[in-house]
Every structure is written in C-alpha cells, then in structure tokens.
Amino acid sequence: MTQNEKYIKSFIEALGVEKKIVNENLKYNEIPEWDSIGHMTLISDLEKEFKISIETDDIVNLSSYKEGIKILKKYKIFK
C-alpha cells in the first residue's frame, strides 16, 4: 500500500466515509463526519498508520486533505 493509499484509508476509517468523499477538496467541518471528534480520531489514526507523533500546531493546522499532505511532508511521509 502506498503512502497516499494509507492516507486516504485513514480518512475513510476515521471519519466513516466512502472513498469518493476523500479528495483534494475535502476540508474540516465541510462534512458532518469531520467535526472536532472526527478530527481527533483522524489524527490518532494518522499517528498509528504512519508511526509518528503529530505536534499540537500541526493538529490544529490540519484543516483540509491538501493541508494534511503538506503537514505529513514535515514528518517525511510524503516527498
């Protein structure tokens, strides 16, 4: 499984949404599933999936699918 596939899988599992919902336009609070609880579930899932510990500022700043990729580059998950 590629890093991108793992990233998408984390959104699907943490938010309980279908794959078609997870795309570059997805943003925090744009769907009911990505509320504050869904956000923390997503963070937890990303940390487990990629074996990282996400810093507090990055947790707050992960406000969209695209922003998440930028943040994960910092942790050398994406290039």
Please place each PLM-identified region on the residue numbering:
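Phosphopantetheine-dependent thiolation modules in NRPS/PKS and related acyl-activating systems
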Residues: T2-W34, G38-I43, K48-K79
